[in-house]
Amino acid sequence: MSKHFVITFQRQRGLSLVELMIGLTLGLILLLGIIQVFISSKQTFATNDAMAKLQENGRFALEFITQSARQAGYTSPGSTLSRPFPVERTVCGVGNTGNNPCAVNGSGSAADVVGFTFEPPVIDGAKRDCAGAVVPDNNLVVNAFYIIPADANNPTAALGCKSFNRTTNAALSAGQRLIDGIDSLQVLYGIDTGGNSQSVNQYVSADRVSNWGRVVSVRIAVLANSVDVLNPAPVQRNYYLLDAAPFSSNDGRARQVFTTTVQFKNL
């Protein structure tokens, strides 16, 4: 008995226009989701990088200043130099003229200036100031810290330092940018009102210090920014540094206040 096989052919059907449009729509939605995740990841990375830079700027700025503050008033063992006041309050030449004192209280939210006097210790075979210039033996140095404003070549303000030889009254280092992204520097001076305990009774600004011999500590605050502009920009707010008027900016950069206190040991 023979068997017969019947082969039937099905007509091939393609996608309808509606199905094609639905597929394209789903594909676009998926693509938009991937793009959104990519953009969000990029923004998160940029924000985290900016915040890390901000933290680094603030910590390094305080470290530069406190290195000099901890040495303030120091003279090496056996030195013939008279022990200086830790805080220098006479002419520093910070700014555009040579008539600016080292201890300046900025008006309102304007930055302060602070200078510390000491005999530099020998490091790597030489005595150096805050900018790395060599200081001769048996000479006192003054490291003065201040804020260098932004300009056409530098979009953000910076912590600056310049120094001079306190023994000869000669300039050592011209103004140097130390740390970019520092908007403000504020300083308060701890006063021992009794004059015999080296214990702080009050903190005051430079213009309220009547007896620099009773200054036994210094409180320092800096306002650091992220240098890079963030997108989306942080919400504009006020930043409070010690007794200064609030600082505010809407330039799209993140900011944070860093504060420390240094007790003078060389009194």
Label every model-predicted segment.
Residues 6, 49, 53, 57-60, ...:
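Short linear sequence signals and composition-biased patches located at protein termini or domain-edge surfaces
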Residues 83-154, 160-162, 167-170:
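C-terminal globular interaction/adhesion domains in large, modular proteins
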Residues 15-18, 114, 143-145, 157, ...:
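Residue-level detector of short, conserved catalytic/binding motifs and their immediate flanks
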Residues 2-8, 12-74:
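Aliphatic-rich helix starts adjacent to a transmembrane/signal segment
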Residues 24-27, 35-37, 84-89, 150-155, ...:
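N-terminal start-of-chain detector that recognizes signal peptides
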Residues 37, 41, 157-159, 189:
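A short secondary-structure junction motif
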Residues 155-158, 179-181:
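Catalytic core of tubulin tyrosine ligase-like
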